[in-house]
């Protein structure tokens, strides 16, 4: 997406050899207008996939996921990091490595929110090494959801 590329070039900062800092507009301070355009683009690319849920991981992916969900008119489910008393034991869980923090986190999604047959679009704020997405795919597989990988068009 050209608009995101331009924003990264203008405001992104490279830290070391392998980190792109985008907290000025994406995950510390959020440019909602930019997220709306990103949400529209996700809708355009995945419009024919009959998405009925969007799955992300807390915390930075929630903003993009929520705005995108408005365009699909579907709920957002997010994997919670760590143990939570209000989630209970009826969960799917996996371990996800955070590239930027250098730590592993247990993430969980209640079994009430992912079901077999769901058509789930995974959204995250940024792709470092794919660990968050791989963890979310693992959770979906645990739910025995219908797994259909559709790659977006490049245009």
Language model regions located:
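Short glycine-rich phosphate-binding loop at a beta-alpha junction
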Residues: 51-58
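Short, glycine/charge-rich flexible loops or terminal/linker lids adjacent to PRPP-binding catalytic cores
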Residues: 74-120
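Short Gly/Thr/Asp-enriched flexible loops that form oxyanion-binding sites at enzyme active sites
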Residues: 63-72
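Conserved small/polar residues in nucleotide/adenosyl-binding loops
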Residues: 147-153
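Active-site/ligand-binding-proximal alpha/beta "capping" segment
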Residues: 128-142
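Active-site-facing substrate-recognition patch
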Residues: 1-51
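Gly/Ser/Thr-rich loops at beta-strand to alpha-helix junctions
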Residues: 58-63, 129
